[in-house]
């Protein structure tokens, strides 16, 4: 008798728990919608062409960029879904890097000009997010790399230099982030300026040297996931004999 009473009660509590969980989940989701990147999308469309940045245009529209940075500043990234959070920090890195360049533009010839003997530009505390002041290094090395553990991020964040991956002319978005990261990685790795294969010597970007651990110390293996055409064929054919070395890095500004 008692058992017949208890079972429906338990079932009722379980059902109620599912309803509460679903309701609370919907409330949480409603409280953390995707970030509004419309201003950034507008600016990128106007001032980024084939990966080259029109800093003069951004300078004229700096107030508009500041509006977008204010949007980022007011976001609580911890309340975003994982892919939205990943995209948020990529966009934040790139947008704040543009802002950094504008602090010295038009006189700046390299992002390194904005540093000093005692402080690199990547260690400047000027990035404002959710009541905190961060550095570009904080975003890259304390958040993006350790939290998301995705080496493709190295081809999405842009350090305003010619040897960096090109800035794409659209924001990164959580809903299509995987496809965007694949495209950015594939485009960079297959651009002839970013590699040279001469017999058994393979010159690649210094990114692979600086962040070897992120690529499991297997440059060729990573390349084979994204290489196309003749490059892929040659890498596959000579994989066991290839020696990897690194191209010089051009830190001059990635402007038009």
Where are these regions (language model features)?
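N-terminal secretory signal peptides that target proteins for export/translocation
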Residues: 1-7
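Low-complexity, intrinsically disordered tandem-repeat tracts enriched in small/polar residues
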Residues: 6, 22-24, 209
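Interaction/scaffold regions that mediate signaling and macromolecular assembly across diverse proteins
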Residues: 32-256
């Amino acid at each position: 008798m008692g058992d017949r009473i208890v079972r429906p009660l338990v079932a009722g509590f379980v059902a109620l728990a599912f309803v509460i969980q679903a309701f609370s989940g919907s409330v949480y989701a409603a409280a953390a919608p995707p970030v509004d990147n419309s201003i950034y999308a507008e600016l990128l469309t106007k001032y980024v062409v084939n990966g080259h940045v029109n800093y003069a245009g951004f300078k004229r529209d700096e107030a508009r960029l500041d509006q977008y940075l204010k949007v980022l500043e007011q976001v609580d990234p911890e309340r975003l879904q994982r892919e939205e959070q990943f995209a948020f920090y990529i966009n934040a890195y790139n947008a704040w890097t543009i802002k950094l360049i504008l602090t010295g533009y038009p006189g700046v010839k390299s992002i390194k000009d904005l540093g000093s003997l005692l402080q690199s530009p990547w260690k400047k505390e000027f990035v404002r997010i959710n009541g905190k002041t961060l550095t570009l290094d904080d975003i890259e090395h304390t958040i993006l790399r350790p939290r998301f553990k995705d080496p493709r991020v190295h081809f999405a964040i842009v350090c305003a230099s010619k040897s960096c991956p090109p800035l794409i002319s659209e924001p990164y978005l959580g809903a299509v982030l995987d496809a965007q990261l694949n495209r950015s990685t594939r485009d960079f790795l297959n651009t002839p300026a970013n590699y040279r294969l001469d017999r058994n010597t393979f010159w690649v970007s210094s990114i692979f040297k600086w962040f070897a651990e992120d690529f499991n110390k297997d440059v060729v293996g990573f390349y084979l996931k994204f290489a196309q055409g003749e490059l892929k064929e040659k890498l596959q054919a000579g994989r066991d004999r290839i020696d990897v070395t690194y191209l010089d890095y051009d830190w001059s500004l990635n402007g038009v």
